[in-house]
Amino acid sequence: MNIDLNADVGEGCASDSELLTLVSSANIACGFHAGDAQTMLTCVREALKNGVAIGAHPSFPDRDNFGRTAMVLPPETVYAQTLYQIGALGAIVQAQGGVMRHVKPHGMLYNQAAKDPRLAQAIAKAVHDYDPSLILVGLAGSELIRAGERHRLVTRQEVFADRGYQADGSLVPRTQPGALIHDEEQALAQTLDMVQAGRVKSVTGVWTTVTAQTVCIHGDGEYALAFARRLRAAFNARNIHVIA
């Protein structure tokens, strides 16, 4: 059994270089919520050095709140902003002799696109128009995945090791209790359930089905590196191969 393990990088975390030795895919911030040209270049070089698949991590224009502010923007604006960010990273990747493999929206753009078909359509169209061979990463079972499929993109359904789930398979908003899982054992058990059994237990105690093709681990947590190592060890023990 294979699973992709991804992390968001280029967001100001000192652990990026070490984290890139543990994951198979990197989602690199493109400047709208965090990062700049220099951090993008640094992350691309580190990813290439470690054989990690490179992806763009576009966001709403929201550096003040790390891309976590809800916004209502015209789909054409979201299309243009997404295309702009993908193109910026794509130029750096190409200049370094690499190939960009995927796109994963960030923060509130990701969450809103999971439920808003028009927003999801704008993102999927931007990805397709830039490069139809790119993989679109989105929340498992979401509108973003469906929009990607309509554009005949390869999609990858994502689950989160350290996030709480609602009964409908969506993530618990960060403003609500249970949004983040701080207990390492609970996060590990949840991840293995999602990957091996295709199910997740919601904060209300209801089990719901989920398709896990890639697992996100956040690099900004206090124990992120230790957890990443434990998760890799748990996968190895169960003959689950981490591969992009």
Swiss-Prot record:
Q: Which CDD domains match?
A: LamB_YcsF_YbgL_like
Q: Which reaction does it catalyse?
A: 5-oxo-L-proline + ATP + 2 H2O = L-glutamate + ADP + phosphate + H(+)
> InterPro entries, alphabetically?
Glyco_hydro/deAcase_b/a-brl, LamB/YcsF/PxpA-like
Listed SUPFAM superfamilies = Glycoside hydrolase/deacetylase
Q: Name one GO molecular function term.
A: 5-oxoprolinase (ATP-hydrolyzing) activity
Q: Which UniProt keywords apply?
A: ATP-binding, Hydrolase, Nucleotide-binding
* This enzyme's EC code(s): 3.5.2.9
Signal peptide residue numbers: none
Q: Which domain of life is it from?
A: Bacteria
Q: Name one Pfam family in it.
A: LamB_YcsF
KW ATP-binding (keyword) present: yes
The UniProt subunit note reads as follows: Forms a complex composed of PxpA, PxpB and PxpC.
Q: Which PANTHER family match?
A: 5-OXOPROLINASE SUBUNIT A, UNCHARACTERIZED PROTEIN YBGL-RELATED
Q: Which family does it belong to?
A: Belongs to the LamB/PxpA family.
Q: What is this protein called?
A: 5-oxoprolinase subunit A
State the organism of origin: Salmonella newport (strain SL254)
Q: What is the lineage of its organism?
A: Bacteria, Pseudomonadati, Pseudomonadota, Gammaproteobacteria, Enterobacterales
Name the gene for this chain: pxpA
